[in-house]
């Protein structure tokens, strides 16, 4: 990818996702009309953000850094409250812009803060992790965690632009790059099988942050999300397909007190969802088995604690897709054919979890659909 690629998200307020290398300089042009700019970022990229702040200041913009905790520690009401206080102190009004720098967690909290400050101010996302690029920065969903669960408090607040500078991937720790690949693989299974073919053909290239394979994977995964978001901004039905693998994943994250990387949990969740669909008679063996094979090629986890099902069911009960106590899972009816499985029998869930862990089946508890 030599020239920047612009992917249009045709939502209620259309915007571009610009994908390329060496793009941070474009941010100045995007923000020229901003009264005040708040650069929300995680500690690990302070030097980069300070350089951006200096460039904005040189262009005559009133820009301020707002540092928030890394990863899921940054997605709390206390952190959002801190950000609101800073926005008040720097005088960010309705002509101001919030800019997020970092991974998915920073994107979430910055989007949430922007969406609630003065009932909504502009936000521009500059994701610097693979997960942020292909998932969190696109679509306008923003939320924070509470003791009740992950992302249960949030808003829909679309960005005015997303700037995906692939050069930032070159500074990522390898385990973070690997974790982000789970969302890329998810996009392959729900909509674009070419993603899976590219990974299978060159798994090392898929993890080379400076290579062309990862650039193509990122572009394709972003296009998948842009297409789905354009069809369903508010997650009423179609957009639920983006939660493939996430019902179990969010329960794992909650059980692990958010010490697991989101992508690692999604990887396990994808395998579980495939087993669930296989046992329900909805997914062929080849496609179900392909989940684990592709994820293994990338070094992602594909199993979990065999004794954790009861705790995980508690976490799944508070999943956003659950309705009136009935668990709902996104499953596949074939490659790139996502659907929904509602209220599966507890024995089916237990069997799928057993297939995931390779351990004897546990009793999932309860009966019928009231899991």
UniProtKB/Swiss-Prot annotation:
- What reaction gets catalysed by this protein? 7-phospho-2-dehydro-3-deoxy-D-arabino-heptonate = 3-dehydroquinate + phosphate
Q: Per UniProt, which keywords does this protein have?
A: Amino-acid biosynthesis, Aromatic amino acid biosynthesis, Cobalt, Cytoplasm, Lyase, Metal-binding, NAD, Nucleotide-binding, Zinc
Task: List the EC numbers from the record.
Answer: 4.2.3.4
Q: Which residues bind NAD(+)?
A: 70-75, 104-108, 128-129, 141, 150
Q: How is the cofactor bound?
A: Binds 1 divalent metal cation per subunit. Can use either Co(2+) or Zn(2+).
Its annotated pathway reads: Metabolic intermediate biosynthesis; chorismate biosynthesis; chorismate from D-erythrose 4-phosphate and phosphoenolpyruvate: step 2/7
Gene Ontology biological-process annotations: amino acid biosynthetic process; aromatic amino acid family biosynthetic process; chorismate biosynthetic process
Question: Where in or outside the cell is it found?
Answer: Cytoplasm
Domain of life according to the entry: Bacteria
Annotated residues that bind Zn(2+) are located at 183, 246, 262
Signal peptide (from-to): none
Cofactor(s) annotated in UniProt = Co(2+); Zn(2+); NAD(+)
GO terms for molecular function, please?
A: 3-dehydroquinate synthase activity; metal ion binding; nucleotide binding
Q: Which GO terms describe its cellular component?
A: cytoplasm
Similarity comment: Belongs to the sugar phosphate cyclases superfamily. Dehydroquinate synthase family.
Sum up the protein's function in the record's words: Catalyzes the conversion of 3-deoxy-D-arabino-heptulosonate 7-phosphate (DAHP) to dehydroquinate (DHQ).
Task: Please report the name of this protein according to its UniProt entry.
Answer: 3-dehydroquinate synthase
Q: Which organism is it from?
A: Saccharopolyspora erythraea (strain ATCC 11635 / DSM 40517 / JCM 4748 / NBRC 13426 / NCIMB 8594 / NRRL 2338)
